[in-house]
């Protein structure tokens, strides 16, 4: 299944806030469709399977990844020691496109993906154009030393100044340089998600 390229606010109305996909908030409170209902009412009427599916979709669309990618990350998380749900979230948070977004270099994960794909971002002074690249501890994230690249990222940094940089990262706004100091923790996810239901979804399918 490919990445979503449709109306973003339509997804927000259906799934709730998706900060990685869009910072906009829909003025409409009902879910999409002719017979749309308030989200709270819809949640009460959902079956256990429907709730698991909803959480899975929230995670996939927020991080803008394909079904195949998410399944691969779930399998990876299951093979590691610890809480599978929290490990899954940490894996997603350590993707390069998400790190760029968390540093404030881009307003959304979607925009961060574009920066990475177009070669604007460096990891340890080397160009990395793979959004899914898994960042490691102490890696340095910076911007290509070209005026167009730096001007673009500076603009994004100014726009995202109200959002704090997570505690596992550090960022120098003047030099546009970030460092991965630690693994992402649950408290900085910024998405209302029940990751255990996501794990259950794949365990039952």
UniProtKB/Swiss-Prot annotation:
Keywords: Chloroplast, Plastid, Ribonucleoprotein, Ribosomal protein, RNA-binding, rRNA-binding. Residues 22-42 are annotated as: Disordered. One of its GO terms (molecular function) is rRNA binding. Residues 94-157 form the S4 RNA-binding domain. GO terms for cellular component: chloroplast; small ribosomal subunit. Coiled coil: none annotated. One of its GO terms (biological process) is ribosomal small subunit biogenesis. The keyword Phosphoprotein does not apply. SMART domains: Ribosomal_S4, S4. Disulfide bonds: none annotated. InterPro entries: Ribosomal_uS4 (IPR022801), Ribosomal_uS4_bac-type (IPR005709), Ribosomal_uS4_CS (IPR018079), Ribosomal_uS4_N (IPR001912), S4_RNA-bd (IPR002942), S4_RNA-bd_sf (IPR036986). PROSITE patterns: RIBOSOMAL_S4, S4. Its main location: plastid. Residues 28-42 have a biased composition (Polar residues). Part of the 30S ribosomal subunit. Contacts protein S5. The interaction surface between S4 and S5 is involved in control of translational fidelity. Belongs to the universal ribosomal protein uS4 family. This is Small ribosomal subunit protein uS4c. It comes from Tupiella akineta.
